Amino acid sequence: MSITSVASVFKGEFAIGSQVTVRGWVRSRRDSKAGISFLAVYDGSCFDPIQGVVPNSLENYNDEILKLTAGCSVVMTGEVVDSPGKGQAFELQVSSVEVAGWVEDPDTYPMAAKRHSIEHLRELAHLRPRTNIIGAVARVRNSLSQAIHRFYHEQGFIWVSTPLITASDAEGAGEMFRVSTLDMENLPRNDEGKVDYSEDFFGKESFLTVSGQLNAETYASALSKVYTFGPTFRAENSNTSRHLAEFWMVEPEVAFADLDDVAGLAEQMLKFCFKAVLEERRDDLEFFAQRVDKTVIDRLESFVSSDFAQVDYTDAVEILKSCGKKFEYPVEWGIDLQSEHERYLAEEHFKAPVVVKNYPKDIKAFYMRLNDDGKTVAAMDVLAPGIGEIIGGAQREERLDVLDARLEEMNLSKEDYWWYRDMRRYGTVPHSGFGLGFERLVSYVTGVSNIRDVIPFPRAPKSASF
């Protein structure tokens, strides 16, 4: 496709004097008394718009160019020249401007104002990509997702597309969205008066997936190194800045790997992604550092250069209890660490990313490998300065008898997990993996604190518009 991007002009891919055509939207128009207009046109390929210097000698100057407002779409052709102004190296001496689309009423155009609160923009999810902040988030999100695929490809992993509709609860928490084609006004009932799901589309109770992990484990048991990258769903009625009902997860699974192996993999992956975004999206990161969080670039560079610390959960609890800091949530062995505990460990105690390992079994999922002490499981969380938990993982329970005992402990049906149990009956192997909440990663990189602002169309309680 031979469409010229604004980014390619700024990268110097066209020699001075070249004729180029850019296509995009007007960010602003400024007119001078000398009969020249300056159009700032962006196409989303980079943070900055390109400036077009438009002479009044153009045929449509008075009828169209002087009527252009923010949001109008244009096709602008001109000669690449050095820019005498600050902020960009090149601009266009324009020879033609074709208006592709007008803004119907500039006075009511929601994006006309120079600044909107980020909360207000959530009500305009269809238009908010046109703003500086959401456009920058989208480019960073793209850069990170491409880096993740590159990393796993270079490491010899195979990408597996796991199903979005499932009959299994990978977390055992029960917070799942039901998928059904039954008539809600006339539900079929069995002899016990319960809904008869045998008459439903799938012939049994089905849900949107909370994780692709269990399915990925089956492929790791044949292909050794696999990963999933796709949407997951949680029907958790939490209306907070850290929760979404629909979000994306990255979940690698590795056969013959133990917990330390995947802790190392997590460190490699995060550093690879952060290096990529620092290199590819410096313009957007500089915007975030200026307008959102001044520490974003320093934080990423520090992360990349830091060695990860490691600590057992039991030792972490002792560190927290003896640190002298008063926490909102008291610390004792057996609790699930809260964000304030995680951030203290990463930001104040270790002053580096930290892997917390070997959690109490009672606060973790059934599939995590039981340690020899019978009280803890081979689970880990990766904690990052500035956000807390960013990755959760575990060595999986490969012993059928222990897995069955855990299912029984948690009142889960062995029959529901018959296929998962089969993997322990036919050539079982030690294997491990982790899950990375992709939106949490984007939030960490951009400094945008509300997770609803780092996904294009957020889904949350009472919020499913667009």
Curated annotation (Swiss-Prot):
Pfam families according to UniProt: tRNA-synt_2, tRNA_anti-codon
Subcellular locations according to the entry: Cytoplasm
Enzyme type, top EC level: ligase
Keyword hit for Protein biosynthesis: yes
Superkingdom of the source species: Bacteria
Keywords: Aminoacyl-tRNA synthetase, ATP-binding, Cytoplasm, Ligase, Nucleotide-binding, Protein biosynthesis
The name this protein goes by in its record: Asparagine--tRNA ligase
Organism: Shewanella sediminis (strain HAW-EB3)
Taxonomic placement: Bacteria, Pseudomonadati, Pseudomonadota, Gammaproteobacteria, Alteromonadales
